[in-house]
């Protein structure tokens, strides 16, 4: 196929990770000619989702010096005990038999319902390519147990984990946080400016349990977090409540690997060309035309702009990698927490874990079959923490012991791996734009900011991902753009249109 490609492009994007796919879609959407290449045979790179077989094959792959996925290992476990209520006995063979029913993320994320990504998906109309599942519970560990943190007003008053007094205190505190910012000169802002958010909580005389709820699950901050940042995080949480469910979070159906592909679809709709299993062998800058010359599979391509993921170009492959994110991925035949957290066959839950000193943290995402990420009767646990070493199992040991040592979770499969990042920025002497690797964050804010920044440098006067019209809104040459297809309108607008037409007819009769 590469032989049939045009030789000239406005933009060549190398790598199909989330950030690269955003940039490719944004370029194609404003009418730029885009070529999107990836040396892998699948979309997404470390942002991808895999079937069970494909994940094992990926973890078994020999690690190349520039590969972002490293230190990988996995283990199949024999079941120590089987529940009498289990409809199916799970083991390695039965799990692999349903390999295609799995969608296992290397780099899982949760979306704030009013966060940057959701707003971008709606604004650009890319949301039509994606489906989401509301997260059922935001949890924390309290006195050795996993408990649900009440988010909405109804949750607060229905929860059995708080006393009546604590419920009132929590509602009063959340109301104060929600009002913060409307008057930045209020007494609290002045009194606690330069102090910590924990000091503010203590001054409100909330109980230890409420303080844990706020610090661990709502603001998701630490003892040294400033008052201003703690308020901003709490407001972000509250601002996403009540949109799509009881919690402020969403998870992509069929795994996070669907999201880069959503942007790739938009890029292709607007003329972007895709070539998988195609590497770039060499890149040079033509000093006369100020264009890039890219050599790939024996063909020379010309591009005005080049964007690449780290490690995908010859010049960036020599950069040393260092551990960045330590990951654990587990498959179990039973969920974490009590029955209340897992009604109807298992909840989609989020849990923030802290070490004993509170200096380190990890995020756990529990997925059930309701997300389309695994077969019914199985559960996926995604565990993520900033890397401290080349041994992800050691980095995560303090958290896995909290989760599994005293729980009834029946682990069938466990895997550990590291997502690495370059120890220094890729050389930019040739003016190639290199995207950042995945960072340790809950949502996609950093990746979107990175995509916006690179796009703005290439096309400073262009809008980043303007709304794409729906198919019925597209006017073909020769059609009357003012003509409306009544059947494509919502019912209320159809009624208004009918009334307007009748009124017009009556005016004609009167005249």
Swiss-Prot record:
Secretion signal, residue range per the UniProt entry: none
Coiled-coil region list: none
Chief site of localization: cytoplasm
Subcellular locations according to the entry: Cytoplasm, Perinuclear region; Cytoplasm, Cytoskeleton, Spindle pole
GO MF assignments: GDP-dissociation inhibitor activity; GTPase activator activity
Keywords: Cell cycle, Cytoplasm, Cytoskeleton, GTPase activation
GO biological process, one term: small GTPase-mediated signal transduction
Tagged with keyword Cell cycle: yes
A cellular-component GO term for this protein: perinuclear region of cytoplasm
A Pfam family it matches: GDI
Superkingdom of source: Eukaryota
Presence of keyword Disulfide bond: no
PANTHER family on file: CHM, RAB ESCORT PROTEIN 1, RAB GDP-DISSOCIATION INHIBITOR
Family: Belongs to the Rab GDI family.
Role noted for this protein: Binds unprenylated Rab proteins, presents it to the catalytic component B, and remains bound to it after the geranylgeranyl transfer reaction. The component A is thought to be regenerated by transferring its prenylated Rab to a protein acceptor.
Protein name: Rab proteins geranylgeranyltransferase component A
Organism classification: Eukaryota, Metazoa, Ecdysozoa, Arthropoda, Hexapoda
Gene (name only): Rep
């Amino acid at each position: 196929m590469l032989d049939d490609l045009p030789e000239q492009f406005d933009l060549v994007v190398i790598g199909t990770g989330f950030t690269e796919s955003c940039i490719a879609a944004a370029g194609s959407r404003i009418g730029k000619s885009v070529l999107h290449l990836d040396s892998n045979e699948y979309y997404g790179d470390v942002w991808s989702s895999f079937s069970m077989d494909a994940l094992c094959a990926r973890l078994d792959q020999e690690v190349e010096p520039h590969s972002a996925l490293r230190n990988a290992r996995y283990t199949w476990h024999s079941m120590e005990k089987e529940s009498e209520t289990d409809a199916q006995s799970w083991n390695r063979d039965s799990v692999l038999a349903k390999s295609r029913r799995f969608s296992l993320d290397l780099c899982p994320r949760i979306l704030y319902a009013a966060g940057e990504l959701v707003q971008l998906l709606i604004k650009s109309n890319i949301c039509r390519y994606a489906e989401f599942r509301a997260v059922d519970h935001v949890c924390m560990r309290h006195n050795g147990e996993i408990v649900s943190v009440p988010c909405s007003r109804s949750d607060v008053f229905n929860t059995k984990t708080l006393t009546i007094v604590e419920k009132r205190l929590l509602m009063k505190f959340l109301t104060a946080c929600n009002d913060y910012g409307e008057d930045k000169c209020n007494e609290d802002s002045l009194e606690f400016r330069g102090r910590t958010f924990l000091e503010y909580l203590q001054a409100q005389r909330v109980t230890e349990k409420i303080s844990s709820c706020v610090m661990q699950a709502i603001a998701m901050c630490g003892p040294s977090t400033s008052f201003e940042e703690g308020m901003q995080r709490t407001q972000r949480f509250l601002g996403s409540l009540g949109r799509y469910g009881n919690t402020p979070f969403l998870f992509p159906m069929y795994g996070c690997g669907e999201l880069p592909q959503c942007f790739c679809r938009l890029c292709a709709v607007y003329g972007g060309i895709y070539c998988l299993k195609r590497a770039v062998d060499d890149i040079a800058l033509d000093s006369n035309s100020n264009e890039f010359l890219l050599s790939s599979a024996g063909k020379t391509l010309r591009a005005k702009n080049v964007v690449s993921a780290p490690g995908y170009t010859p010049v960036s492959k020599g950069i040393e990698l260092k551990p960045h994110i330590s990951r654990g991925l587990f498959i179990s035949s039973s969920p974490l927490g009590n029955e209340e957290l897992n009604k109807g066959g298992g909840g989609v839950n989020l849990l923030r874990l802290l070490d004993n000193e509170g200096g380190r943290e990890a995020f756990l995402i529990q997925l059930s079959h309701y997300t389309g990420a695994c077969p019914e009767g199985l559960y996926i646990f995604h565990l993520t923490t900033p890397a401290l070493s080349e041994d992800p199992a050691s980095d995560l040991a303090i958290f896995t012991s909290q989760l599994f040592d005293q729980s009834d979770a029946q682990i069938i499969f466990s895997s550990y791996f590291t997502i690495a990042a370059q120890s220094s920025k890729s050389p930019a002497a040739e003016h190639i734009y290199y995207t950042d690797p995945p960072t340790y964050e809950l949502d996609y804010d950093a990746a979107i900011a990175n995509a916006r920044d690179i796009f703005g440098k290439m096309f400073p006067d262009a809008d980043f991902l303007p709304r794409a019209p729906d198919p019925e809104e597209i006017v073909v040459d020769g059609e009357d753009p003012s003509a409306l297809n009544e059947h494509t309108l919502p019912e209320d607008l159809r009624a208004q249109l009918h009334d307007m037409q009748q009124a017009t007819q009556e005016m004609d009769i009167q005249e």
